[in-house]
Amino acid sequence: SMAGLFPEGKEFNVYCDTPASRVVAERWPTEIIFSGFEIGNMIFTGKKLVQMDVKDSPVKDAYSLCFAEGDPNGRMSWDLTAVLVAVKGYEPYYNVERGTFRVVNDEGANSWTPDGKGKDLRLIEKVPAVEMAVLIENYMMHQPVSK
């Protein structure tokens, strides 16, 4: 899940619906792997993608709009880190810490308590952000093979 700011803070995906975030944090029946704001914030992607000679790409078109609005070095990759881990797993890209995620107030601030018996994991940078940007952007630029 792309949610939270670690070890504590306030992040949009939590505070945009604090009651729902609290319910998920307290009642979700399985382990949640949190990719916090700090993980994707320094991973800039999209610059090479928008320069590709490909037409009718909704991903390229969306990134082109971001660049037009002032992201000349690329777009932060918060959600993309969560997708990468969901598809490929966190190894070898990230270390993890086990603990408990909590929504601590009605404004949607969160906290993290490290605990070897906690039900959640949070990602911790292992591969430098610049290398992660190359890896993620290469996946974004992949073109389907024609049959």
Residue ranges and their predicted role:
Residues 15-19, 23-26, 31-147:
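Conformational coupling and interaction surfaces
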Residues 1-9:
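Class I SAM-dependent methyltransferase SAM-binding "motif I" and its flanking Rossmann-like core
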